């Protein structure tokens, strides 16, 4: 097998949470360009339909599941619908998540804390359970968890540490699952993005413009990442190009964590 052939995903199916827009949409496109069929999970039917219409042009099968993964029940339902398609899912990209609120930790309600943990952490666990069992039965699969550089560090100027805490836990879950499933054919790795030009981040910067410059000043490359710059990394981790790699995290942050 040639080096380039190791990156090919032809005939495999990838389940991408939050796959209809933002970083998830960009990663889904890269997986499709490498030959993977897609099952996109998202909350909004219109956004899913638009993504499906565009991605099928790449010559792959694209199915969509409208679901809200902010509850464990929603994640179970999404996985069940995907499995009911009768297509073996060999790649799971746990991308869905978000900060959503900017509240000081001392004022954070436990109800909201739990809800955001469900979104950023529990959804990944549930999807790994529901889709990981068939992978283990087949002895083959790759799971890619999207963590964040906010896992090992506290982002300056942002209040409320639910996101940092959940993403740190997702990194720990990545390593734990990797150790548990390594000799059963299922690899589990993570990507930790830095600050990227996405719609949610644009909203944050519009509401709090001082943060934009604060973050930019902390990036040695002097720019934010573009969503398509995550694509090659997810293809690498999903493919046989990383066949001897599990429990690892790729940090893609323009050097943010160098300082």
Model-derived features with residue positions:
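Short C-terminal tail/terminal secondary-structure segment
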Residues: 2-6, 99-102, 235, 246-259
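Conserved glycine-rich cofactor-binding loop
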Residues: 13, 20-21
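The beta1-alpha1 cofactor-binding region of Rossmann-like NAD(H)/NADP(H)-dependent oxidoreductases
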Residues: 45-46, 66-78, 110, 228-229
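Substrate-binding pocket helix/loop in short-chain dehydrogenase/reductase
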Residues: 103-105, 109-117, 143, 211, ...
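Active-site helix of classical SDR
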Residues: 128, 166, 174
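Alpha-helical segment proximal to the catalytic Tyr-Lys
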Residues: 133, 179-183, 243
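Residue(s) in the substrate-gating loop at a strand-loop-helix junction
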Residues: 148
